[in-house]
A protein has these predicted regions:
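Hydrophobic, small-residue-rich membrane helices and short re-entrant helix-turn-helix hairpins
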Residues: 1, 137-147, 198-228, 297-308
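Membrane-interface helix termini and inter-helical loops of multi-pass transporters
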Residues: 27-34, 104-115, 168-178, 243-252
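Hydrophobic, membrane-embedded alpha-helices of multi-pass small-molecule transporters
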Residues: 6-25, 127, 164, 176-240, ...
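TM-loop-TM module centered on a large, flexible mid-protein loop between adjacent transmembrane helices
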Residues: 72-75, 79, 110-112, 220-283, ...
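Membrane-interface loop-to-helix entry segments
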Residues: 119-167, 178-181, 219-223
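Membrane-interface "cap" regions at the ends of multi-pass membrane proteins
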Residues: 1-38, 50-51, 55, 67, ...
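Juxtamembrane helix-boundary/capping and inter-helix hinge elements in multi-pass membrane proteins
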Residues: 34-37, 63-67, 76-82, 206-215, ...
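Hydrophobic transmembrane alpha-helices that form the core helical bundles
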Residues: 30-34, 42, 51-128, 133-136, ...
Length: 317
């Protein structure tokens, strides 16, 4: 058993860290291009869908009273082969997800720092290695860092949103084409990936203090926090650069909005938020997927090396 159990703040940070992990940076322009002035509504709809999924996941986890998420649900239902395949697909997906987060971290930080062409790749590798080392130090260490990172990045994004909303003009939210209801729905579908991450909590169930109570109430807080910051950013960023620029700038739209707000300090702050977002997502994904791998290995569906723990009580592989 791990030496440190996760309280409300740590569980909230893992979920929010997994969700606000770069999605808002890459999807905002796509959502505005589809939904126009109704982009915030798309984020709300996406959040409601995520909450429905998260509520079901939490309720099933509490009812089963065991970790593992969809893997354990399928296994307990007798679909062992499907559960095994699902576990392998999930774990492979989390490895690729961490690689994407690390690539984004390297791209953002390398762009600001300049330097040789290999620097972004080196920074990406360093981010992965640093988070692996942190997770090997135990749940308490990883959770404490996750809380600090998530609070910092949300504060930066909230500050950017406040600056933009102080200049609010509804006319600036419009795009050339009228999006209509279909555009709002397409926008909501495209932002659902920005809410991906809440499912990590099902793998951490055994690590939680008073796990039934905590798992039963964490989803609205975590998903609601992500949805709130997404909606505020969706309303604020067009006030600073205009919808056309947000659409054309793609994943650097928020960085450009930060520069429009505060010049170079704003650019650096938003770049820091992007870097922290990817790092927190790497940390949350490594922390939770290692526990999924341990659960699968305990059932004999992965090599026993994945079930081993180090002296800190953390999965060591």
């Amino acid at each position: 058993m791990e030496k440190d159990k996760l309280g409300f703040a740590a569980v909230w940070a893992i979920a929010v860290g997994g969700m606000v992990g770069g999605g808002i940076f890459s999807t905002l322009g796509v959502v505005i291009a589809n939904a126009g002035q109704w982009a915030a509504v798309s984020f709300v709809l996406g959040g409601l869908i995520a909450y429905a999924s998260g509520h079901s996941l939490a309720a099933l986890t509490v009812a089963k009273n065991e970790p593992g998420g969809i893997y354990s649900f399928l296994r307990d239902a007798g679909a062992t082969t499907t559960a095994r395949i699902c576990a392998w697909v999930l774990l492979l997906g989390y490895v690729l997800t961490c690689a994407v987060y690390a690539f984004t971290f390297g791209a953002y930080t390398g762009n600001v720092l300049g330097g040789p062409a290999w620097l972004p790749q080196a920074l990406a590798s360093a981010a992965i290695l640093a988070m692996v080392a942190l997770n090997l130090r135990g749940a308490g260490q990883a959770a404490g860092v996750e809380i600090a990172i998530v609070v910092t990045k949300l504060a930066i994004l909230a500050g950017l949103a406040a600056f933009g909303l102080s200049q609010f003009d509804g006319a600036k939210l419009a795009i050339d084409a009228s999006p209509g209801l279909l555009g709002v729905i397409v926008g909501a579908a495209s932002v659902f990936m920005a809410y991906e991450g809440f499912e990590l909590l099902a793998y951490d169930y055994d690590e939680m203090k008073d796990r039934k109570h905590l798992m039963g109430r964490i989803m609205p807080w975590a998903i609601g926090s992500a949805a709130l910051i997404y909606v505020l950013v969706a309303l604020a960023v067009p006030m600073l650069t205009g919808t056309k620029a947000v659409i054309e700038d793609g994943e650097i739209a928020l960085a450009n909005a930060g520069q429009a707000a505060l010049g170079m300090p704003g650019l650096l702050l938003v770049t820091l938020a992007a870097a922290l977002s990817t790092v927190s997502a790497i940390n949350a994904t490594l922390f939770s997927s290692a526990r999924l791998a341990r659960e699968v290995a305990d059932d004999g569906d992965l090599p026993q090396a994945f079930a081993k723990r180090n002296e800190a009580g953390s999965p060591s592989l």
